[in-house]
Structure formats: C-alpha cells, structure tokens
C-alpha cells in the first residue's frame, strides 16, 4: 500500500494581553503499540477459579499482561487464559477439567510438565504507562510449521497417514488432532490419544481438512469406508482427483458423480498429495520418535458440487477487510483508510455469483 505523508505548515498567532499568556498548541502523544513474536518463556493465570481470569506471560524477556476476557487464538479454536491451564485433555462443557498450574506450555515449567518442543507466541498490544498489555495473541508450536508429500499408506487402526515421496521411503507420520472424531477416528481410539494436546486440535466446525476447492475430507474408520466418510465420495474409481460431487457437472473437466453425497466428507486416499500443519508429538515419551498431530490438511484434489446445489463450500486463503473508520482531526491526518476489501479463495460451485 502506498504511504503518503502530508506536511502541514502551522502559523502561530501570538496574542499579547495584560496578565495572560497563551501556550502553543501541543499534539496529544499517541499510545505506543508493540508486536512481539517469540517463545513462550513463562505463563501464569491470576485466578484458577475464574474461567475468564486475567494472567501474564513472558516473551523475549518482556512481561506482558493478559487482561481478563482475552480470547487467545489457537490453531482451531479460541481459548481463555484459564482454559490453557486445563491440560492436554480439557474435556468439554459441562465436564471440563479443573484448571491447575502449570500449563505445560512454557519453557519455565518444570518436568514432567515442561514441553519437549517450545511454543511460539505472537502478541500485539499497547504500552500503557510502564505496562505491556495484550490486545490479541496466538499460540502455536510454530506458526509456519508445515510439511508436504504423497500419502503412501494409511494405518486405519491408528488413523495415521504415512507420507513421503511418491514411490520412495516413508518419511512422516501424520494424524489428525481430532478429539471429537469429526474427520475420522477420535483421538482416544488412535492408541496415542492421551499424547495429543486437545488445545491445538483441528476446528470441528469450519473444516480445515479439505480439498483445494474447500470440500471437506476425512480418514475413513476402515479401508471399507464408513457412513460419514464413504468411499463413493471419491468417484467410481475410488481415488479420483477432479470431479463433481453430484448429478450435474460443474465443468467438463470435472465429470459428475451422482453417487457422491455433497453433505458427506470425501476420504483421503493413497496417492493423494497433501500439505499439512500441526505440532510434533512424541509417540513414545523420551524415545525421540515423533508424529505430526495435524490441525490442518489440504489435499491436491479438485472436488466440486453441482451448480446451485446445497451444500456448497468455500475456502478462504486470505481476507483483507477495510473498516474505514472516522478520520483523525488535524494535524494528525496521516491516515490510510478504506472501505474496500479483498478475498482470495476457492469454491466448490464457481457458477454462483
């Protein structure tokens, strides 16, 4: 975005009067902001009994106040500071785990709670007086932690994708971090469920396990498929990569598959090229063998839906929304404001306008 700077020349009018002096106008000092990215060194909560409690953390040696009611962006959900202290298996309402210290996320946490891999924090806020106060923050093991490769095989018993080069040796083991079983086996049924951290799970509502068009995908419970992840949703050949899920083709290059049900997910299959994001998780504590607990998987497949048929899906890669806002009064008018917006994404039904 082009930045413009306007220089304003001010003319000072000096008024002399008996017994009175007028000072020159002074601009108000703006509140300084900050943005930090670094490892989570310390994390604390003020009141374990308050689900919306305030807290504090240390990042890059800087102590930051986490105000009450702050929602923290995780890979697939939003949590409060108090939620971070419910452990790897926080449960769900009304049977939530009791919050207790430490969180197991900070480098200062002592064994056996010390994380084997440090967590990364992004935080933005304001400096009020002598205090850094967070306004937005996110936690991930690594913000840009991604991998890619071909699905060489699928271990249905443990819900694991074995990923590597096509025709080459196996290199990565990827499991969906899925406590509820939205995209396949729930974590407790995978044999390593207690080792996954539900705080970093995949979003169960807005599907992050998708084709390139945004069609939701899954790992079947068995090689025969299941009712929520039927094999027929990959076309007649069982591993088609570009087709229309429905009776009417959306494009000649994406043939219609009437048996495909757009309200169901499409199974990931051997031979699919995928990219994935997640966190390194020890399969056997202390043994140094890791797998990826994925919160997002994107398959290089083009699965569409019939024109005008519901449901249709949208995948948004980037959204820039201008909020306009009230203009600053002079002389503080160096403001870039716009009401325009930009979306970059894909849809299963490009005929819709």
Predicted regions and their residues:
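Bacterial N-terminal signal peptides
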Residues: 10-19
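Short, flexible, surface-exposed loop segments at domain boundaries
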Residues: 25-353
